[in-house]
UniProtKB/Swiss-Prot annotation:
Known glycosylation sites: 133, 298, 361
Keywords, ordered alphabetically: Glycoprotein, Secreted
Annotated InterPro entries: Serpin_B9/Maspin, Serpin_CS, Serpin_dom, Serpin_fam, Serpin_sf, Serpin_sf_1, Serpin_sf_2, SERPINB5_serpin_dom
GO molecular function, one term: serine-type endopeptidase inhibitor activity
GO cellular component: cornified envelope; cytoplasm; extracellular space; sarcoplasm
Annotated gene: Serpinb5
A GO biological-process term: prostate gland morphogenesis
Subcellular location: Secreted, Extracellular space
Family matches, as PROSITE patterns: SERPIN (PS00284)
Site (Reactive bond homolog): 340-341
SUPFAM superfamilies given in the database record: Serpins
Secreted in keyword set: yes
Protein name: Serpin B5
Gene3D superfamilies: Alpha-1-antitrypsin, domain 1, Antithrombin, subunit I, domain 2
Amino acid sequence: MDALRLANSAFAVDLFKQLCERDPAGNILFSPICLSTSLSLAQVGTKGDTANEIGQVLHFENVKDVPFGFQTVTSDVNKLSSFYSLKLVKRLYIDKSLNPSTEFISSTKRPYAKELETVDFKDKLEETKGQINSSIKELTDGHFEDILSENSISDQTKILVVNAAYFVGKWMKKFPESETKECPFRISKTDTKPVQMMNLEATFCLGNIDDISCKIIELPFQNKHLSMLIVLPKDVEDESTGLEKIEQQLNPETLLQWTNPSTMANAKVKLSLPKFKVEKMIDPKASLESLGLKSLFNESTSDFSGMSETKGVSLSNVIHRVCLEITEDGGESIEVPGSRILQHKDEFNADHPFIYIIRHNKTRNIIFFGKFCSP
């Protein structure tokens, strides 16, 4: 499981950096675990360069049994929906004209139980689109309507990946609603936007990353199954969001160093965090191509012969939609700011852009990866 966690973490960082390059000052949010699960399912049906490229981009070199690893992580995470408003939906739709081989169907059946579906894009496009939209809406408890837009698919679509993920967290320690105030959020050195700022004084795991003058904090959600880790620059020092230095230094190794529990310690913290909701529809295709998935999306070079005898088949599209909501909600309310319990306090004031991950603590896999630049 460790090898898979490291692979997923490396892929998450690679894709995050690609998305940052394409949208330097925008909010970013995606679910690396959803994408890597879907691409690993597609990989089962590929051969040759296509299979090798997926393996390289997803960093599977040292991972022994990829499908089984994902099965374990997925079932662990899905159990959490009884504690949180959390859903990760991952689907691979294959046009029935491809007549997927029985070998492919049987080898994916157990590890990717309900993630594979054969549909009819060619002759029943509108009906299929309607079915996928209503199925995703139902699976996400109504969070995502019409995940497929007009131009997401066509009657030429052969293979389609659809990811839909949302999370509405409940904290281990509730933020007192009476302490939420409107404050300026500094989107750059010179500009601000108003934001509802939540405030709490409590003990959290805190660390300093001195070489990039940042702080990192771990905020556990109820039952500690998930945590939000936030990397916050001490100030906005560059001419953009203040995150340039972190983004340059960020790689799979530095992320592991920064989030290593041994570099963090419990501290009494005066915490200020924006209340926010981010919903993103990302098109990861160009970013994945830049990372090295050269043949997967190209009909003349992709090799899906492990799935179908049909020639000229490629992955037609990747739809990836995610929603994250951060509010005061949580467990027992604890000391209200202003009470004299905490004498010496560290401040963690997220009133300027920050990078965050939502981590599954049991497997230490990254469920969501994002940056918050503007309310």
